Amino acid sequence: MSRVCQLTGTKANNGMAVSHSHIRTKKLQQANLQQRRLWWAEGKRWVNLRITTRALKTIQKKGLGAYAKSLGIDLARL
């Protein structure tokens, strides 16, 4: 399974790890993905999603159906 958020499409970021002596090495910063089973009220069913914690906070604020609609995602396919 790929490490990509199913709603936002967030994936890993290429960054640098900088030591105390300022030696820089490449580092991969992974997205904070969580496997969640969320209730989709409009579809009257549970939906299993692998989403970032940022997307989870937005879902708690807006609701799953409204957030997916704003992103242009059809939850019926998931």
Swiss-Prot record:
GO terms for cellular component: ribonucleoprotein complex; ribosome. GO terms for biological process: translation. It comes from the Bacteria. GO terms for molecular function: structural constituent of ribosome. Keywords: Ribonucleoprotein, Ribosomal protein. InterPro entries: Ribosomal_bL28, Ribosomal_bL28/bL31-like_sf, Ribosomal_bL28_bact-type, Ribosomal_bL28_sf. NCBIfam families: L28. Belongs to the bacterial ribosomal protein bL28 family. HAMAP family: Ribosomal_bL28. This is Large ribosomal subunit protein bL28. It comes from Synechococcus sp. (strain WH7803).
